[in-house]
Amino acid sequence: MVTFSSGKAVTFKDVLSNLHILDYDYYFNVVDGLLAENATQPLLLLDEILRKGFDGQNFIVGLSEHLRNLLVSQDSRTVQLMEVPDSIRKKYAEQAQACSPSLLLSWLNISNQCDINYKASRNQRLTVELALMKMANVNAVFKSNGKGEANATAEPAGLKKKLNP
């Protein structure tokens, strides 16, 4: 890393840039947008990430890992399963309080399907964008279906009924 630092102090941002790694903050901001049931913020963040040269599949894999860490951080007995610094662990604990386990499982299911289908897709960007839009709307679908909250499936029966009368 010293070679790339131009003689100045090496910062966390420099390391991320040189190693081409996405910062945790991107994923925290994506989840904030999803919690607000707003697809715009996650889509704009995805665009920014793609413009920086990151691969869409790397983004979705990172988002899946972030969602998994949120789920794991909801139980004090499983927090040790996260391999992150203590400062980041605290941020996970804070964000996890705003997410139900069923919502996180629904999002994980959607992101996992996106990851599986990514390579076969002819429009990979759309595949990731569609996953983000589904995640942003999963709670709204369940609320309109009268269930109140998302369960662990990505495509609820109510949605299928609306699409196939």
Question: Which role does the model predict for each range below?
Answer:
Residues 157-165:
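Long, low-complexity intrinsically disordered regions
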